[in-house]
Structure formats: C-alpha cells, structure tokens
C-alpha cells in the first residue's frame, strides 16, 4: 500500500481492478505479521479471523476494499471492545459505532482494533496489559496517544486509514510522533455514537492518514460533500501564530516548524504573531475539569448502553496503568470535582468559543498555525512520566476546548525524529481547513 501515492489513487486502482481487494488484504496481514512487535493491534484471537473481507455487494462504492482499522474504544460488531483495559478483556461488541457503519457503507474493510492508552487516559499508548505501542518510524521511541495504535498502523503501512478519538489531542499527538496526518473535525461533525467516551463535551471522532490530501478525500466522503473536481482553493492565506504555542520549544521542533513557515512564506502565505495570553488563561480552566467530571457518568452510561453487566468498579479495580489508576482513585475520592466548578468551566467554554471567533476576525486570519507538540518525541523509557501529559497536550487542547477543526502534518527532516505542525480553522470550516492544508502539504513537499 505504501507505493500508492494517495488513498484516492488506491480506491481508483481497486475500482479499475488494477489491484484485487484480497491482495490488499493479504498484504496488510503480511505487514502486520512482520511487525507484531509494534503492538498496534489488540487481537483477542488470530488476525486473519478478525480482518474482514471486501463485501461484493458494495463493489463500486467509494472506499470498496480499503482496509480501515479502529481504535479499541470504538464498537465494531463481532470484535472485542476493551478500551485498552484488562477489565474489559473478552467483551464483544454487538453493534457497530456510527462511524463504522458509515465506512462499511462506503465499502471499507474492517482491519481490526488498535491498541491505545488505557481508557484513553494518556498520551503514550504504553499499555501495561496489551503492550506498549511501538513507533514504526522511530524505533524505541513513543508512538503517542491515546490513539497510538491507530497512528502506528498507518505509519507502518498496514492500513492507509485508521479512525481514532481525540479529547485533548489523542489523534494529533500520535500522528505527530509517528510522522503522519491526524485530523480532528469540528466537535460533533462525526457521530460519537457507539464509542466508549471520556467526555461528551470534548470527545471527537477523527482520522489518521498518511497525508492531508487523504484526510480531505475521506472526510469529503463522510460528510457527503465529496466532489469529482478539486475544491476551490483560496491560495496562500493569512495565518496566525499564537505566541504561547511557539514558546519554550525543543530546538529540533522549533527548527523544523520555522523551516516549514519559511517555505510557505516564499509562496505567498502571510504569518502574523497573535498575543493569546487571555485565551491561554481561559483555556486552562477547561483542560482537566470538564473531562474528569464527565468521565465517570459518561463511561458508566456508555457501558450500560452496550450491555455491560459487571459495573464500572469491576473495570477500575483492574486498571494496570499506575497514572490512570491514580487519576481515577483521586477523582473518585477527595479530588472529586464539585458541580459548581464544572458548570463554571462549561460557561468558560462558551466564552472561549466567542473569544476564538473574535480572534480570527480581529486579526483577519484564516488559520492558526503552531507546533503540534512543543517537545521532541520521547524515548519509551522516559515517556511515562506524569508531567509529560500536560506538556504533550499544551498546544493541542485549545482546539478541543474551543471545538475547532484541527489537523497536524509532518514537517520533520528525513532521518530525524518526527515533528508535527498543526493548523486550526474556525468552527465548521472543516472543508476549508483540509483544502488549505492539502495545499500547504504540496508546497512543503515541493
């Protein structure tokens, strides 16, 4: 699959029978078998039996025969659903999540379920029960999380598309660490029905692909706005650079991102620094309060709707990740967030959305641009530090709290650790964001 230039070209090759869907399936299985040490799939059973086959009745649909994997907090009928935690081992989903149904209707083949950070509560995908997800492009280094298995499956060439979830950066962080594209749509644009949640306010279904062009292609199909000709592009645009997000950067991250801006500037893109101090202060009031308050009710309600019989304490008692266990125990006890504090944070969320609208308008900018993660990809031996979580989501969490569409693309130099550069657009401007970042991607690739 890696020799296929774009996902659209792969779909065309399948439709024209230049490649057989079964051949594509066998290639993916062979690649996974060679790369089992990546731990990017959760397989309760053999891979062959859990890897679907192209539905001949759907031949002619847009994604017919394309293998797609799903983070293991997403329901796929007949496959295990563990949310990356030992306490749910053996549970089989009896329904498809809405996003799975959509992709199946487009002809996609379910390749399996991806490993993840336990219960989505982290950014490393170092999973004590299922194994740490390896980084295919930087062996020995962290794959990121919580959708780390999805990023690794795409980056290694097992699948061209994976579906993950993003609460505060859980798609974009692993995409940046694995040198691929991660797209979080405007919150609510893709249904979260059939997904084990962290926070109904912040959770978002999104896409992990090799390129921004691939993400644009798939999102167009999912949103029903796919066209047979390129979207009208506005050309180079004015992009805001939030000062806080460009501060205290690792040297390699800073160099890679500044080099990318320099290339874009030469082709007509305009950049302006944005003083975002008031935005940062407001954003910090939502980062942990909202998801940690909502998780316990949302998680329990989700399990009940899926037919779980054992209660949430059966799961919590078997949590293996020490950091996750600490968070859960703290917030079930003395650290429980008060309802008034939660409601205040929700009000701040509405204020944040208004302030972001004003920021785009006041500075006459079309996009925001910033390094996806301020630090370099950590080695696996050093990634599981509690303080790394806050560092990793420092830049990505604003888009989550303001419900903006956001995408990261790789800009790191060949042969060095991956670096991601992110772009956000105003809410509901998903197609505009994807179109412009696809253009940016082409400029950067020369």
Swiss-Prot record:
Which top-rank group of organisms is this from?
A: Bacteria
Q: Which Pfam families match?
A: Amidase
Name the pathway: Plant hormone metabolism; auxin biosynthesis
Which Gene Ontology biological process is one annotated for this entry? auxin biosynthetic process
Please name the GO terms that the record assigns under molecular function. Answer: hydrolase activity
Q: What is its EC number?
A: 3.5.1.-
The active-site annotation reads: 71 (charge relay system), 146 (charge relay system), 170 (acyl-ester intermediate)
For this UniProt record, the keywords arranged alphabetically read as follows: Auxin biosynthesis, Hydrolase
Whether Lyase counts among this entry's keywords is no
**Family the UniProt entry places it in:** Belongs to the amidase family.
Q: Which PANTHER family match?
A: GLUTAMYL-TRNA(GLN) AMIDOTRANSFERASE SUBUNIT A, TRANSAMIDASE
What function does the entry list? Hydrolyzes indole-3-acetamide (IAM) into indole-3-acetic acid (IAA).
> What is the protein name given in its UniProt record?
Indoleacetamide hydrolase
């Amino acid at each position: 699959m890696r020799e296929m230039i774009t996902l659209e070209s792969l779909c065309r090759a399948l439709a024209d029978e230049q490649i057989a869907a079964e051949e594509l399936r066998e290639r993916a299985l062979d690649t996974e078998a060679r790369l089992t040490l990546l731990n990017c799939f959760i397989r309760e059973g053999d891979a062959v039996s859990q890897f679907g086959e192209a539905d001949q009745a759907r031949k002619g649909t847009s994604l017919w025969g394309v293998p797609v994997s799903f983070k293991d907090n997403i329901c796929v009928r007949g496959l295990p659903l563990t949310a990356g935690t030992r306490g749910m081992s053996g549970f089989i989903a009896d329904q498809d999540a809405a996003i799975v149904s959509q992709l199946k209707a487009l002809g996609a083949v379910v390749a399996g379920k991806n490993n993840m950070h336990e219960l989505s509560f982290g950014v490393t995908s170092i999973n004590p029960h299922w194994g740490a997800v390896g980084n295919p492009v930087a062996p020995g280094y962290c794959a990121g999380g919580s959708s780390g298995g999805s990023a690794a499956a795409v980056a290694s060439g097992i699948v061209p598309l994976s579906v993950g979830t993003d609460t505060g950066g859980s798609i974009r962080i692993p995409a940046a660490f694995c040198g691929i594209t991660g797209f979080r749509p405007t919150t609510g644009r893709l249904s979260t029905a059939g997904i084990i949640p962290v926070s109904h306010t912040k959770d978002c279904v999104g896409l992990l692909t090799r390129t921004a062009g691939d993400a644009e292609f798939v999102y167009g199909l999912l949103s029903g706005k796919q066209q047979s000709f390129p979207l009208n592009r506005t050309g180079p645009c004015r992009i805001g650079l939030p000062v806080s997000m460009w501060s205290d950067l690792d040297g390699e991250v800073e160099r890679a991102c500044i080099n990318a801006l320099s290339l874009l500037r030469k082709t007509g893109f305009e950049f302006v620094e944005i003083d975002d101090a008031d935005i940062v202060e407001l954003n910090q009031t939502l980062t942990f309060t909202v998801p940690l308050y909502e998780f316990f009710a949302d998680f329990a309600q989700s399990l009940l709707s899926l037919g779980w019989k054992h209660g949430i304490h059966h799961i919590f008692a078997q949590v293996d990740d020490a950091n996750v266990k600490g968070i859960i125990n703290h917030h079930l006890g003395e650290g429980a967030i008060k309802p008034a504090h939660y409601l205040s944070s929700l009000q701040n969320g509405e204020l944040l959305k208004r302030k972001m609208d004003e920021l785009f308008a006041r500075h006459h900018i079309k996009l925001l641009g910033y390094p996806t993660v301020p630090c370099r990809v950590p080695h696996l031996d050093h990634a599981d530090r509690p303080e790394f979580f806050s560092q990793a989501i420092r830049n990505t969490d604003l888009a989550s709290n303001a419900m903006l569409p956001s995408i990261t693309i790789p800009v790191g130099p060949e042969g060095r650790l991956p670096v991601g550069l992110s772009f956000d657009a105003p809410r509901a401007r998903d197609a505009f964001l994807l179109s412009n970042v696809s253009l940016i991607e082409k400029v950067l690739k020369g």
